Amino acid sequence: MAMSPAAPLSVTELLLVSAVFCLVFWAVRASRPKVPKGLKRLPGPWGWPLLGHLLTLGKNPHVALARLSRRYGDVFQIRLGSTPVVVLSGLDTIKQALVRQGDDFKGRPDLYSSSFITEGQSMTFSPDSGPVWAARRRLAQDSLKSFSIASNPASSSSCYLEEHVSQEAENLIGRFQELMAAVGRFDPYSQLVVSAARVIGAMCFGRRFPQGSEEMLDVVRNSSKFVETASSGSPVDFFPILRYLPNRPLQRFKDFNQRFLRFLQKTVREHYEDFDRNSIQDITGALFKHSEKNSKANSGLIPQEKIVNLVNDIFGAGFDTITTALSWSLMYLVTNPRRQRKIQEELDAVVGRARQPRLSDRPQLPYLEAFILELFRHTSFVPFTIPHSTTRDTTLNGFHIPKECCIFINQWQINHDPQLWGDPEEFRPERFLTADGAAINKPLSEKVTLFGLGKRRCIGETLARWEVFLFLAILLQRLEFSVPPGVPVDLTPIYGLTMKHPRCEHVQARPRFSDQ
């Protein structure tokens, strides 16, 4: 039976459709913030109703937004749900925003996921950016410096960090050798995350956690639950309905933060019970002493109950970033055996076999340093900073950006910008060496962006760079890493706050010298 053709719309229906269209168009235009005279409106693609540009971001938002920057420029706007988000790309533009106009861009958006990190009191994630926040940040930075990269008069090591990493690297080599003897292969990530946690634990609490501590293992081995949800563009932060629907990643994120906070609260409480005010040996002790001093002065800068919040930020950053960097390093080494041998030849020539590498060897090991810089650039495993927000109406590159606007900083785009690097997809450590290969090209090395910039720059950046260097130097002096012939190594990054690679359980480590 033939279907009759659809009847044409009546004049009334056409008028109604036109009226609805005009109303929607007017509402969209009216919702756009007014731009002061002489300034430009933010460019950007049209998004879907309700969803905005969520589908555009896909599984790799850093790549999708870098692609959009080629069309719309270094400053453009997208929408996630109904929330406008300004995306910044380009090294010069990002430096202008975060360094030269740092006060305008130092805020944090009030994101739903951040409310679960130390119960919304995280110095790193919370929206607070006022004088008290700045003072606490300086205090955390000074305490971290004092018990990591500052000299330790009671040790033969150059600093606390060198002492802790040297000891932990020896333990790590022993664990790798035990696993090789038992099963002939291992997953390096599961071992590295424990070592990194033990090092930052020693700096925070003056002691390394026992190797088999179930509490510590439960926390650090589930840290991936955190980076899944805390990443830029997490849907739960921009689509409120997702908070009320079954959401396994969100529930895992909440559970992890609760366990992590309980673990640190218990550890900080135990540490306070045997705290010696006359002999400060760690970060938490320094914070206790400062808290008591300011309590007597009634300044209230850091009441004792807030100490765990600062320790949470320092401890959390101190093991995830390090673990991720070291794990990526081993994956690149087993897939680049020629470069691994070149690093080892440099270590043999400079350090030899009779002693461990030390931090003072860094200037004489430029190829290892170049490898680390190129690893940071090529993986860009921190693709975005934690989102920023504007603290007041401001202007950037001639564009008007209103107060309390969410800002995404695309670090991945900087590190893969052909104008900066020429061949960004090539892994080539030599690009960071001077013409004679004897030193690092400092101006070029400073363009690698992984730890943020300006007033929100990662307070543990120096610690991270030194720790990654020392771990790799000690491991590569003693061991040769490989995978069996024919075993594929997947280097596809998995998007998150820090991007991980798929786990590889077939890494092997063999002693380089017969007398080991």
Curated annotation (Swiss-Prot):
Induction: By beta-naphthoflavone and 2,3,7,8-tetrachlorodibenzo-p-dioxin (TCDD). Gene3D superfamilies: Cytochrome P450. PROSITE patterns: CYTOCHROME_P450. It is found in: Endoplasmic reticulum membrane; Microsome membrane. One of its GO terms (molecular function) is steroid 17-alpha-monooxygenase activity. GO terms for biological process: arachidonate metabolic process; cholesterol metabolic process; estrogen metabolic process; hormone biosynthetic process; progesterone metabolic process; retinol metabolic process. Heme binds at residue 458. CDD domains: CYP1A (cd20676). Keywords: Endoplasmic reticulum, Fatty acid metabolism, Glycoprotein, Heme, Iron, Lipid metabolism, Lyase, Membrane, Metal-binding, Microsome, Monooxygenase, Oxidoreductase, Steroid metabolism, Sterol metabolism. PANTHER family: CYTOCHROME P450 1A, STEROID 17-ALPHA-HYDROXYLASE/17,20 LYASE. This is Cytochrome P450 1A2. The gene is CYP1A2.
